[in-house]
Amino acid sequence: MKIDILSIFPDMFSGVTGNSIIKKAIENERVAVEVTDFREYAEGKHHIVDDYPYGGGAGMLLKAQPIFDAVQAVKEKQPETKPRVILMDPAGKRFDQKMAEEFAEEEHLVFICGHYEGYDERIREHLVTDEVSIGDYILTGGEIGAMIVMDSVIRLLPGVLGNKDSAVTDSFSTGLLEHPHYTRPADFRGMKVPDILLSGNHAWIEEWRDKESLKRTYERRPDLLKNYPLTDKQKTWLKEWSDSK
């Protein structure tokens, strides 16, 4: 996979690409990440990327020209691919695990990270394929959001995680929150690991994990259960918890 990031603050990404799983993914050639300062594509000797909005109003808008030209330039470097051009914007579609899995199937992603009051609307209408939001709040720019999406996508690529099952069993990958985890010692200052996890009975352990995953979701994110395909056993557990309230 190739990931291009367009930002006027490219140095923000050095910490993300130079550490942990993303660094290893780059070193192992599972992904190539290139960060471009789209100010370099702005016309005029001062390379101005923003301007006042027509009709007045507060703030400055990112101009269409430098972003259109920057996207065209990264496309020309990968002419064999048809990239998803992703605009990080609070008005976009809420990012979730399903979207991460969808993006992970692509060959080429281009992230546009904005600043100031917003974008010239022609960028949305004629350039991007996806508008993505990481939540209902405002950040200074799109860089942090792009980092979040990029991390979520890269860890899904084949060969990136050491354990191939890790991405499958993570919270949200199954549609439910993940079950509790414990490691040694079995008794830490009187706080004990559930006996069933020490039993060696894998069928019991899997059922316990399934039940705890459902319970955690029911207690913390009941909205996730709205369209979840519950088994008969899971329905019985939910009824027990509901009746005990």
Swiss-Prot record:
Gene3D superfamilies according to UniProt: 3.40.1280.10, tRNA(m1g37)methyltransferase, domain 2
InterPro entries per the UniProt record, alphabetical: Alpha/beta_knot_MTases, tRNA_m1G_MeTrfase_C_sf, tRNA_m1G_MeTrfase_TrmD, tRNA_m1G_MTases_N, tRNA_MeTrfase_TRMD/TRM10
Pfam families named in the record: tRNA_m1G_MT
Principal place of residence: cytoplasm
EC number of the protein: 2.1.1.228
A biological process term (GO) from this entry: tRNA N1-guanine methylation
Role, per record: Specifically methylates guanosine-37 in various tRNAs.
Name the record gives this protein: tRNA (guanine-N(1)-)-methyltransferase
Natural source organism: Listeria monocytogenes serotype 4a (strain HCC23)
